[in-house]
Design a protein with these regions (language model features):
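Sec-dependent signal peptide recognition
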Residues: 2-7
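Short, linear, compositionally biased motifs with a strong N-terminal bias
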Residues: 10-11
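N-terminal signal peptide c-region/cleavage motif recognized by signal peptidases
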Residues: 14-16
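Outer membrane beta-barrel
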Residues: 21-35, 54-187, 235-239, 310-314, ...
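Surface-exposed strand-loop-strand hairpins of Gram-negative outer-membrane beta-barrel proteins
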Residues: 33-61, 217-220
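Outer-membrane beta-barrel pore domains
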Residues: 37-39, 52, 96-100, 116, ...
Length: 397
């Protein structure tokens, strides 16, 4: 299926010259970063930010190229290609899908799409490349979605469009996401904007991999048990009151199954809301779920919860945003010494300025305070504070 996604993207680019309706764009995202705290998760640590203990550095966060190819009024192809210095391949795909949505003159409309795409879960990550128009770093919830979740399958949607409001219901069936949950269990929540590509790997903490004599990397988009997962969602949108979203997700993985690595049975409920009050944008989301692996008679389950509240204000070329996150995990294990618990909070403040269409500058400060018992096993203090300040320059075309 992942090879099919590549072929879909290639067919889109090949057909671009003959297309009558091609749109899209791209960007190069540079960062000047000052960060302190634990070693970053991408470097094998237990840190809670993308750049961890890097200190002062200049980074290419990513470069992306995305496009819509409208083959007809009903049929659309979308692809999002990305380069990021630490990814496994020179160019990777974040999404690639085809959508069929017949023209409807009635209040009812339906659509179906197939390929690889993000589940309809985010209130904040609404821009291309699983990015947010408000901050550089997404919430803990949406950082995890970008790292471990992708719908590689088919989603059907039904919409009812009223004069002032809209109702949507979607159901999806997917595969190749049997490892989703391993990062939550082995590392906990992380506030990061590094999205895992379809052909990329996910880094696990060195402290976890070494005792198991296993690799420190996992391929999150892997099919192990040949059993499809699914999700179902409902959304209500009112032009004056805002939007309310509900999603239930279950990858239906068999926690006993093994094929180079074990499957993780991951399921959760997500509730999100967005509105505008006196010119202030309010975004909020809550997630609660668990993930289970059972390589022997003794299973291992990690419960996880997270929530955030974001307030944003736009004035001309400027945007200002402040967000508060809370998050927690707790493992259920027969061996008390193997149980891991985590809780933490994060505060994010960002100011962005877009003086011209092709340039956006963003200054962001992030503070994460977390307590994780796992650190004690590696002679680290269980309570840690991570700081990260970034000046981002996004060049868009």
């Amino acid at each position: 299926m992942r090879k099919a996604a590549i072929l879909l993207a290639a067919s889109m680019l090949a057909g671009a010259a003959a297309a009558q309706d091609l749109s899209g764009g791209g960007y190069i995202d540079l960062r000047l970063v000052n960060s302190s705290g634990e070693r970053a998760a991408i470097d094998g640590g237990l840190g809670k930010t993308r750049y961890g203990d890097d200190g002062n550095a200049i980074h290419l966060a990513e470069a992306a190229l995305y496009g819509n190819l409208q083959l007809s009024e009903d049929l659309l192809i979308f692809a999002d290609l990305r380069y990021e210095p630490s990814q496994r391949t020179a160019v990777d795909l974040l999404e690639s899908y085809i959508r069929y949505r017949p023209l409807s003159l009635s209040p009812w409309r339906w659509s179906i799409k197939a390929g690889a795409f993000f589940p309809p879960i985010s209130e904040e990550n609404t821009a291309p490349g699983w990015t947010s128009p408000w901050t550089l770093t997404p919430s803990a919830i949406n950082g995890w979605v970008g790292e471990e979740l992708r719908t590689i399958g088919t989603e059907g949607k039904v919409e009812w469009r009223g004069e002032a409001d809209r109702l949507e219901a979607e159901v999806a069936v997917f595969g190749w996401n049997d490892v989703a949950g391993v990062a939550i269990a082995d590392r906990g929540w992380v506030l990061t904007d590094r999205v895992t590509g379809l052909f990329d790997r996910l880094r696990l903490p060195n402290a976890v991999a070494a005792p198991r004599h296993s690799a420190a990397w996992r391929e999150p988009f892997t099919e192990i048990d040949n059993t499809p997962g699914w999700y179902a969602g409902l959304s209500w949108k009112h032009e004056d009151w805002g939007r309310l979203d509900l999603l239930y997700y279950d990858n239906e993985a068999d926690p006993h199954a093994f094929q180079h690595e074990f499957a993780w049975r991951t399921k959760f409920v997500s509730v999100g809301a967005s509105t505008n009050i006196g010119g202030v944008t309010v975004l909020s989301q809550v997630m609660s779920g668990d993930t289970t692996i059972q390589p022997s008679d003794e299973g291992y389950t990690s419960d996880f919860q997270a929530a955030y509240l974001l307030l944003g204000y736009r004035l001309g070329d400027w945007r200002v945003a402040a967000r508060a996150d809370v998050f927690a995990t707790e493992s259920q294990n027969k061996d008390p010494d193997a149980r891991i618990a985590e809780h933490g909070t994060a505060q994010t403040v960002a100011v962005s300025w877009q003086p011209i269409q092709y340039l956006k500058l963003t200054l962001e400060g992030l503070r994460v305070a977390s307590f994780r018992t796992q650190r004690l096993a590696y002679n680290l203090a269980p309570a840690q504070i991570d700081h990260q300040v970034q000046l981002g320059a996004k060049f868009m075309f």
